[in-house]
A protein has these predicted regions:
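Accessory RNA-recognition modules of RNA-modification enzymes
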Residues: 1-251, 256-262
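Surface-exposed, flexible loop/turn segments at secondary-structure boundaries
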Residues: 58, 120, 189, 282, ...
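Active-site donor-binding loop signature of nucleotide-sugar glycosyltransferases
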Residues: 68, 303, 321
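S-adenosylmethionine
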Residues: 228-313
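Core SAM-dependent methyltransferase catalytic element
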Residues: 310-324
Length: 324
Protein backbone atom coordinates (compact mmCIF):
# COMPACT_ATOMS: atom_id res chain seq x y z
CA UNK A 1 0.00 0.00 0.00
CA UNK A 2 1.08 3.57 -0.72
CA UNK A 3 -1.16 5.27 1.85
CA UNK A 4 1.86 6.65 3.71
CA UNK A 5 3.09 8.49 0.58
CA UNK A 6 1.96 11.91 -0.68
CA UNK A 7 -0.34 11.35 -3.65
CA UNK A 8 1.71 13.30 -6.22
CA UNK A 9 4.72 11.23 -5.20
CA UNK A 10 2.66 8.04 -5.61
CA UNK A 11 1.98 8.98 -9.23
CA UNK A 12 5.66 9.77 -9.85
CA UNK A 13 6.67 6.39 -8.39
CA UNK A 14 4.16 4.50 -10.53
CA UNK A 15 5.24 6.24 -13.73
CA UNK A 16 8.85 5.31 -12.97
CA UNK A 17 7.81 1.71 -12.17
CA UNK A 18 6.01 1.49 -15.51
CA UNK A 19 9.09 2.60 -17.46
CA UNK A 20 11.44 0.37 -15.46
CA UNK A 21 9.35 -2.79 -15.84
CA UNK A 22 8.76 -2.25 -19.57
CA UNK A 23 12.51 -1.80 -20.07
CA UNK A 24 13.59 -4.71 -17.86
CA UNK A 25 11.06 -7.27 -19.12
CA UNK A 26 9.95 -5.94 -22.50
CA UNK A 27 13.29 -4.52 -23.60
CA UNK A 28 11.69 -1.18 -24.47
CA UNK A 29 13.67 1.87 -23.34
CA UNK A 30 11.23 4.72 -22.64
CA UNK A 31 12.06 8.33 -21.90
CA UNK A 32 10.26 9.96 -18.99
CA UNK A 33 8.55 12.56 -21.19
CA UNK A 34 7.12 9.84 -23.47
CA UNK A 35 4.60 8.64 -20.90
CA UNK A 36 1.30 10.49 -20.58
CA UNK A 37 0.16 10.39 -16.97
CA UNK A 38 -3.48 10.46 -15.86
CA UNK A 39 -4.02 11.03 -12.14
CA UNK A 40 -7.19 10.47 -10.15
CA UNK A 41 -8.83 13.54 -8.63
CA UNK A 42 -10.48 11.19 -6.12
CA UNK A 43 -7.57 10.02 -4.03
CA UNK A 44 -9.82 8.27 -1.48
CA UNK A 45 -13.31 6.72 -1.66
CA UNK A 46 -13.01 6.06 -5.40
CA UNK A 47 -13.91 2.36 -5.51
CA UNK A 48 -17.43 1.42 -6.59
CA UNK A 49 -16.86 -2.19 -5.55
CA UNK A 50 -15.12 -4.11 -2.77
CA UNK A 51 -14.89 -7.80 -1.88
CA UNK A 52 -14.68 -8.87 1.76
CA UNK A 53 -13.66 -12.23 3.16
CA UNK A 54 -15.96 -13.90 5.68
CA UNK A 55 -15.12 -15.76 8.85
CA UNK A 56 -17.23 -17.44 11.54
CA UNK A 57 -16.11 -16.56 15.06
CA UNK A 58 -16.10 -18.75 18.17
CA UNK A 59 -19.39 -17.11 19.18
CA UNK A 60 -20.94 -18.22 15.85
CA UNK A 61 -20.96 -14.67 14.48
CA UNK A 62 -20.10 -14.13 10.79
CA UNK A 63 -17.74 -11.19 10.35
CA UNK A 64 -16.37 -9.55 7.19
CA UNK A 65 -13.04 -7.93 6.44
CA UNK A 66 -9.66 -8.21 4.74
CA UNK A 67 -6.98 -10.87 5.10
CA UNK A 68 -4.03 -9.68 7.20
CA UNK A 69 -0.38 -9.75 6.17
CA UNK A 70 0.07 -13.21 7.68
CA UNK A 71 -2.36 -14.50 5.00
CA UNK A 72 -4.42 -16.24 7.70
CA UNK A 73 -6.00 -13.74 10.07
CA UNK A 74 -9.03 -11.70 9.11
CA UNK A 75 -9.16 -8.00 10.00
CA UNK A 76 -12.77 -6.98 10.56
CA UNK A 77 -13.64 -3.60 9.06
CA UNK A 78 -16.41 -1.09 9.52
CA UNK A 79 -15.45 0.86 6.42
CA UNK A 80 -12.89 0.90 3.61
CA UNK A 81 -11.18 4.23 3.00
CA UNK A 82 -10.97 3.48 -0.72
CA UNK A 83 -14.68 2.69 -1.19
CA UNK A 84 -17.61 4.91 -2.11
CA UNK A 85 -19.74 6.10 0.79
CA UNK A 86 -22.77 3.99 -0.31
CA UNK A 87 -20.56 0.89 -0.31
CA UNK A 88 -19.31 1.62 3.19
CA UNK A 89 -22.84 2.23 4.43
CA UNK A 90 -23.72 -1.39 3.65
CA UNK A 91 -20.67 -2.97 5.33
CA UNK A 92 -22.08 -2.98 8.91
CA UNK A 93 -25.39 -4.38 7.66
CA UNK A 94 -24.14 -7.30 5.56
CA UNK A 95 -25.63 -9.86 7.94
CA UNK A 96 -29.01 -8.13 7.74
CA UNK A 97 -29.41 -8.49 3.96
CA UNK A 98 -31.30 -11.34 2.31
CA UNK A 99 -28.09 -13.00 1.13
CA UNK A 100 -26.46 -12.26 4.48
CA UNK A 101 -29.02 -14.39 6.29
CA UNK A 102 -28.33 -17.26 3.86
CA UNK A 103 -24.59 -16.82 4.20
CA UNK A 104 -24.78 -17.12 7.99
CA UNK A 105 -26.33 -20.57 7.59
CA UNK A 106 -23.37 -21.93 5.59
CA UNK A 107 -20.72 -24.04 7.29
CA UNK A 108 -18.11 -21.93 5.52
CA UNK A 109 -19.50 -18.46 4.75
CA UNK A 110 -18.69 -17.07 1.30
CA UNK A 111 -16.91 -13.79 0.67
CA UNK A 112 -19.13 -10.77 0.06
CA UNK A 113 -19.04 -8.34 -2.86
CA UNK A 114 -20.63 -4.91 -2.54
CA UNK A 115 -21.25 -2.87 -5.69
CA UNK A 116 -22.58 0.64 -6.18
CA UNK A 117 -24.04 1.43 -9.62
CA UNK A 118 -23.55 4.92 -11.04
CA UNK A 119 -26.76 4.91 -13.10
CA UNK A 120 -29.54 4.20 -10.62
CA UNK A 121 -27.37 4.74 -7.51
CA UNK A 122 -28.32 1.25 -6.30
CA UNK A 123 -25.99 -0.57 -3.93
CA UNK A 124 -26.19 -4.36 -3.82
CA UNK A 125 -24.36 -7.13 -1.98
CA UNK A 126 -23.99 -10.77 -2.98
CA UNK A 127 -21.96 -13.72 -1.76
CA UNK A 128 -19.68 -15.94 -3.80
CA UNK A 129 -20.58 -15.66 -7.48
CA UNK A 130 -23.33 -13.27 -8.54
CA UNK A 131 -26.71 -15.06 -8.44
CA UNK A 132 -28.20 -15.93 -11.82
CA UNK A 133 -31.33 -13.89 -11.18
CA UNK A 134 -29.52 -10.70 -10.16
CA UNK A 135 -30.40 -7.90 -12.63
CA UNK A 136 -27.76 -6.42 -14.90
CA UNK A 137 -25.92 -3.43 -13.53
CA UNK A 138 -26.38 -0.10 -15.22
CA UNK A 139 -23.36 2.19 -15.23
CA UNK A 140 -22.84 5.62 -16.75
CA UNK A 141 -19.53 6.39 -18.46
CA UNK A 142 -18.92 9.61 -20.36
CA UNK A 143 -22.65 10.43 -20.24
CA UNK A 144 -23.66 7.12 -21.84
CA UNK A 145 -25.39 4.27 -20.03
CA UNK A 146 -24.00 0.75 -20.19
CA UNK A 147 -25.45 -2.53 -18.97
CA UNK A 148 -23.16 -5.20 -17.54
CA UNK A 149 -23.79 -8.65 -16.07
CA UNK A 150 -23.98 -8.46 -12.29
CA UNK A 151 -20.85 -10.51 -11.66
CA UNK A 152 -18.74 -9.28 -14.57
CA UNK A 153 -15.51 -7.31 -14.43
CA UNK A 154 -15.61 -3.54 -14.57
CA UNK A 155 -13.17 -0.83 -13.57
CA UNK A 156 -13.55 0.31 -9.97
CA UNK A 157 -12.59 3.98 -10.53
CA UNK A 158 -15.20 5.55 -12.81
CA UNK A 159 -13.36 8.84 -13.32
CA UNK A 160 -10.15 7.23 -14.58
CA UNK A 161 -12.10 4.57 -16.50
CA UNK A 162 -13.83 7.37 -18.40
CA UNK A 163 -10.43 8.92 -19.16
CA UNK A 164 -9.21 5.55 -20.45
CA UNK A 165 -12.23 5.16 -22.73
CA UNK A 166 -11.79 8.69 -24.11
CA UNK A 167 -8.06 8.16 -24.64
CA UNK A 168 -8.64 4.97 -26.63
CA UNK A 169 -11.23 6.71 -28.80
CA UNK A 170 -8.96 9.69 -29.42
CA UNK A 171 -6.01 7.49 -30.34
CA UNK A 172 -7.98 5.39 -32.83
CA UNK A 173 -9.70 8.42 -34.38
CA UNK A 174 -6.24 9.92 -34.99
CA UNK A 175 -5.29 6.90 -37.11
CA UNK A 176 -6.75 8.24 -40.35
CA UNK A 177 -6.17 5.06 -42.34
CA UNK A 178 -7.89 2.87 -39.74
CA UNK A 179 -11.34 1.70 -40.80
CA UNK A 180 -11.69 -1.51 -38.79
CA UNK A 181 -11.16 -2.37 -35.13
CA UNK A 182 -11.00 -5.76 -33.43
CA UNK A 183 -11.68 -5.46 -29.70
CA UNK A 184 -10.19 -8.62 -28.17
CA UNK A 185 -11.10 -9.61 -24.61
CA UNK A 186 -13.84 -6.97 -24.94
CA UNK A 187 -16.03 -7.89 -21.95
CA UNK A 188 -19.20 -5.80 -22.23
CA UNK A 189 -17.61 -3.63 -24.93
CA UNK A 190 -16.55 -0.79 -22.66
CA UNK A 191 -13.48 0.41 -24.59
CA UNK A 192 -14.86 0.12 -28.12
CA UNK A 193 -18.21 1.72 -27.23
CA UNK A 194 -16.38 5.04 -27.37
CA UNK A 195 -15.57 4.54 -31.07
CA UNK A 196 -17.52 6.12 -33.89
CA UNK A 197 -17.08 6.07 -37.69
CA UNK A 198 -15.26 2.72 -37.71
CA UNK A 199 -16.42 -0.86 -37.96
CA UNK A 200 -15.88 -2.84 -34.75
CA UNK A 201 -15.89 -6.55 -34.01
CA UNK A 202 -15.53 -7.51 -30.36
CA UNK A 203 -14.31 -10.92 -29.19
CA UNK A 204 -15.02 -12.31 -25.73
CA UNK A 205 -15.34 -15.77 -24.18
CA UNK A 206 -18.06 -14.71 -21.71
CA UNK A 207 -21.40 -15.08 -23.52
CA UNK A 208 -23.21 -12.86 -20.99
CA UNK A 209 -20.67 -10.11 -21.55
CA UNK A 210 -21.18 -10.36 -25.31
CA UNK A 211 -24.95 -10.22 -24.85
CA UNK A 212 -24.53 -7.01 -22.87
CA UNK A 213 -22.09 -5.57 -25.43
CA UNK A 214 -24.50 -6.12 -28.32
CA UNK A 215 -27.32 -4.61 -26.26
CA UNK A 216 -25.16 -1.57 -25.49
CA UNK A 217 -24.24 -1.13 -29.15
CA UNK A 218 -27.88 -1.30 -30.23
CA UNK A 219 -28.96 1.00 -27.41
CA UNK A 220 -26.38 3.60 -28.43
CA UNK A 221 -27.13 3.34 -32.15
CA UNK A 222 -23.76 1.82 -33.04
CA UNK A 223 -24.88 -0.15 -36.08
CA UNK A 224 -21.30 -0.92 -37.18
CA UNK A 225 -20.44 -2.69 -33.90
CA UNK A 226 -20.78 -6.46 -33.51
CA UNK A 227 -19.66 -8.63 -30.60
CA UNK A 228 -18.99 -12.36 -30.84
CA UNK A 229 -18.71 -14.99 -28.09
CA UNK A 230 -16.09 -17.73 -28.22
CA UNK A 231 -12.45 -18.59 -27.69
CA UNK A 232 -10.67 -15.29 -28.29
CA UNK A 233 -7.50 -16.75 -29.80
CA UNK A 234 -9.42 -18.95 -32.22
CA UNK A 235 -11.70 -16.08 -33.26
CA UNK A 236 -8.73 -13.76 -33.57
CA UNK A 237 -6.95 -16.10 -35.99
CA UNK A 238 -10.11 -16.25 -38.10
CA UNK A 239 -10.74 -12.50 -38.10
CA UNK A 240 -7.18 -11.31 -38.68
CA UNK A 241 -6.82 -13.66 -41.63
CA UNK A 242 -9.71 -11.97 -43.44
CA UNK A 243 -8.94 -8.32 -42.76
CA UNK A 244 -7.06 -5.60 -44.57
CA UNK A 245 -3.80 -4.51 -42.91
CA UNK A 246 -5.28 -1.12 -41.89
CA UNK A 247 -6.84 -2.65 -38.80
CA UNK A 248 -6.41 -1.70 -35.15
CA UNK A 249 -6.35 -4.54 -32.65
CA UNK A 250 -7.37 -3.59 -29.11
CA UNK A 251 -5.97 -5.95 -26.50
CA UNK A 252 -7.43 -5.60 -23.01
CA UNK A 253 -6.69 -8.98 -21.43
CA UNK A 254 -6.98 -10.14 -17.82
CA UNK A 255 -4.02 -9.66 -15.48
CA UNK A 256 -2.37 -12.80 -16.92
CA UNK A 257 -1.84 -11.05 -20.28
CA UNK A 258 -2.61 -12.32 -23.76
CA UNK A 259 -0.34 -15.36 -23.85
CA UNK A 260 1.20 -17.32 -26.75
CA UNK A 261 -2.06 -18.04 -28.58
CA UNK A 262 -2.72 -14.37 -29.24
CA UNK A 263 0.92 -13.70 -30.14
CA UNK A 264 0.78 -16.54 -32.67
CA UNK A 265 -2.39 -15.11 -34.24
CA UNK A 266 -0.74 -11.69 -34.58
CA UNK A 267 2.38 -13.21 -36.13
CA UNK A 268 0.30 -14.90 -38.84
CA UNK A 269 -1.42 -11.68 -39.96
CA UNK A 270 -0.15 -8.55 -38.26
CA UNK A 271 -2.60 -5.64 -37.93
CA UNK A 272 -1.25 -2.16 -38.66
CA UNK A 273 -1.84 -0.99 -35.08
CA UNK A 274 -2.11 -2.67 -31.69
CA UNK A 275 -3.58 -0.77 -28.74
CA UNK A 276 -2.68 -2.77 -25.63
CA UNK A 277 -4.36 -1.88 -22.32
CA UNK A 278 -2.95 -3.60 -19.26
CA UNK A 279 -3.40 -3.71 -15.50
CA UNK A 280 -0.10 -5.54 -14.98
CA UNK A 281 3.12 -4.02 -16.39
CA UNK A 282 4.92 -7.31 -15.85
CA UNK A 283 2.73 -9.33 -18.20
CA UNK A 284 2.57 -6.37 -20.59
CA UNK A 285 6.38 -6.37 -20.72
CA UNK A 286 6.41 -10.13 -21.28
CA UNK A 287 3.98 -9.83 -24.19
CA UNK A 288 5.81 -6.84 -25.69
CA UNK A 289 8.99 -8.90 -25.74
CA UNK A 290 7.19 -11.24 -28.17
CA UNK A 291 5.22 -8.64 -30.14
CA UNK A 292 7.92 -6.03 -30.83
CA UNK A 293 10.15 -8.40 -32.87
CA UNK A 294 7.22 -8.90 -35.26
CA UNK A 295 8.00 -5.44 -36.63
CA UNK A 296 6.22 -3.05 -34.25
CA UNK A 297 7.38 0.26 -32.82
CA UNK A 298 5.77 2.10 -29.92
CA UNK A 299 3.96 5.34 -30.78
CA UNK A 300 2.25 6.29 -27.52
CA UNK A 301 2.39 5.29 -23.86
CA UNK A 302 0.25 6.21 -20.88
CA UNK A 303 0.04 5.40 -17.19
CA UNK A 304 -3.40 5.87 -15.64
CA UNK A 305 -3.67 5.81 -11.86
CA UNK A 306 -6.82 3.72 -11.56
CA UNK A 307 -5.93 2.64 -8.02
CA UNK A 308 -4.70 5.49 -5.74
CA UNK A 309 -3.11 4.51 -2.42
CA UNK A 310 -1.94 1.19 -3.90
CA UNK A 311 1.00 0.08 -6.04
CA UNK A 312 -1.30 -0.86 -8.92
CA UNK A 313 -2.09 1.14 -12.05
CA UNK A 314 -3.46 0.83 -15.57
CA UNK A 315 -1.22 1.33 -18.60
CA UNK A 316 -1.63 1.74 -22.33
CA UNK A 317 0.69 1.42 -25.30
CA UNK A 318 0.04 2.01 -29.00
CA UNK A 319 2.17 -0.03 -31.38
CA UNK A 320 2.48 0.54 -35.12
CA UNK A 321 3.73 -1.96 -37.67
CA UNK A 322 6.88 -0.63 -39.31
CA UNK A 323 6.69 -1.52 -43.00
CA UNK A 324 9.90 0.29 -43.89
Amino acid sequence: AYQHIDYDEQVTIKEAQFRQVIKRIGGLDIDEDEVEVVSSSNKWHYRNRISLNARRTETDEVIYGFIARDNRSLVRIKECLLAHAPVNELVPDLNKTKWGHKNRQRDRPLRATIRHASSNKETVAFYGKAPVGLPWRREVYNDREFVMPAGSFSQVNREVAEALQRMCAEIISSLEACTFVIDAFCGSGFLSMGLRDVKVVGLEIDAKGVEAANFNAQDQGLTTHKYVAGDVNKLLRQRLGKLAPETTLILDPPRAGVGPGTIKAISKRSPKWILYVSCDPGTLGRDLKEILPLGYKHKKLAMLDMFPQTSHFESLILLELDNA
